[in-house]
Design a protein with these regions (language model features):
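Transmembrane alpha-helices
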Residues: 66-82, 170-201
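C-terminal transmembrane helix and the adjacent membrane-cytosol boundary/short C-terminal tail
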Residues: 137, 189, 232-266
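Transmembrane-helix boundary motif in ABC transporter permease subunits
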Residues: 23-26, 71-105, 117
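Non-cytoplasmic
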Residues: 117, 126, 131, 135, ...
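Membrane-cytosol interface at the C-terminal ends of specific transmembrane alpha-helices
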Residues: 76, 125-173, 183-192
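Glycine-rich helix-loop "coupling/hinge" segments at transmembrane-helix boundaries
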Residues: 121-122, 150, 198-238
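N-terminal signal-anchor/first transmembrane alpha helix
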Residues: 1-31, 103, 245
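Generic hydrophobic transmembrane alpha-helix motif, especially the helices
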Residues: 47-50, 91-92, 96-153
Length: 266
C-alpha cells in the first residue's frame, strides 16, 4: 500500500517536473501578453481560458510550475542542510545538545507565515530569497527528527565500540548521517510541501515574488480582478488544484518513505 502511495506521488511530481521542463523551451503564448479575448472561458485555442487582460492562462500555468518547484526544492534543501547539521551535532556532542535544541525551540514557536509576510513587506522577495527565508524558518522540524534518529544510531553497539576505539569523529558522524539519510530524504519532501504552500500563501496575499507568475500569483491576480465574483472559475481552478495536487503527491511520497524507514529501523 505504501509503495502504491509512493508511486502515485512520484507520478504526480514527475508530471509537474515535465511540465516545468517543457515550459523552459516552449509556451503556447507569451504568458504576460494579450493573446485572446478578455475573460474568455476555456477553448481549443486557450485550454484554461484567458484573464481580464486577455492573457493565456494555460501558458501562465505552465510557466508558473517553474518558480513553484524551484522554491519548493531549494527551500527544502536549505532546511535539510541546517536541520541535519544541527540535529547530528546535538545528538553527537553532548554539550551542544541543550543550546542547539533550545535554539530550535525558539524557531519552532515563531509564527512562520506571519513572519514571512512581515519580512516580505519590507523586502520584496525574489524566488531565491523567498526560498532562503522559507528554508531558514523550516529547519527545526528536520533538526529534531534527525537528532532523535541520530541518538538511536549513536547508542547502537557498533557506534559505541567505534567511539571507544578512537575512531575519528568525522568517520562516525558520516556513518550516523548515512543511517539517517532515508529519514532526511522523507522529511525533505515534507519540507518541499511546506515550501509550496508557504509560497502560495505569500503570493496569494500579494507579498511574494509577484513577477514570477507562480501559481499563487495567478490566484492573487484572479482575486484582485474579482474573478470569482464574475464567474471566471477557470482563472482559479487550474492553479488552485495544481497546488493541492502537487502538495498531496509530495506528502504521499514523504509518508511512504518515512514508514519504510521506520519499518527497517524496527
Amino acid at each position: 500500500m505504501h509503495d502504491s502511495f509512493f508511486k502515485l506521488g512520484f507520478g504526480i511530481l514527475a508530471f509537474f517536473i515535465i511540465i516545468a521542463l517543457i515550459s523552459v523551451f516552449y509556451l503556447p503564448y507569451n504568458p504576460v501578453a494579450t493573446t485572446g479575448p478578455l475573460w474568455s472561458p476555456p477553448s481549443l485555442s486557450h485550454p484554461f481560458g484567458t484573464t481580464a487582460d486577455g492573457q493565456d492562462l494555460f501558458s501562465q500555468w505552465m510557466y508558473g510550475s517553474q518558480p513553484t518547484l524551484f522554491v519548493a526544492f531549494l527551500s527544502a534543501f536549505i532546511s535539510a542542510v541546517f536541520g541535519v547539521a544541527v540535529g547530528i551535532s546535538a545528538a553527537y556532542f553532548r554539550r551542544a545538545d541543550e543550546p542547539l535544541m533550545r535554539l530550535a525551540d525558539v524557531f519552532l514557536i515563531l509564527p512562520v507565515l506571519p513572519l514571512l509576510i512581515v519580512i516580505a513587506t519590507f523586502v520584496r522577495p525574489t524566488n531565491f530569497s523567498a526560498s532562503v527565508i522559507i528554508g531558514l524558518l523550516s529547519w527545526p522540524w528536520m533538526a529534531r527528527t534527525v537528532r532523535s534518529s541520530a541518538l538511536s544510531v549513536k547508542q547502537s553497539p557498533y557506534i559505541e565500540v567505534a567511539i571507544m576505539s578512537g575512531t575519528p569523529h568525522r568517520s562516525i558522524i558520516k556513518d550516523i548521517f548515512n543511517h539517517t539519510l532515508p529519514l532526511v530524504i522523507a522529511n525533505s519532501i515534507f519540507s518541499a510541501t511546506g515550501g509550496i504552500l508557504f509560497l502560495a500563501y505569500m503570493d496569494y496575499l500579494g507579498v511574494g515574488p509577484i513577477t514570477s507568475y507562480a501559481w499563487g500569483t495567478t490566484l492573487f491576480f484572479a482575486q484582485t480582478a474579482n474573478a470569482l465574483y464574475v464567474g471566471a472559475w477557470w482563472w482559479i481552478v487550474p492553479s488552485g488544484l495544481s497546488i493541492g495536487i502537487l502538495a498531496t503527491g509530495l506528502s504521499l511520497m514523504g509518508y511512504s518513505l518515512e514508514n519504510a524507514y521506520r519499518g527497517i529501523s524496527q
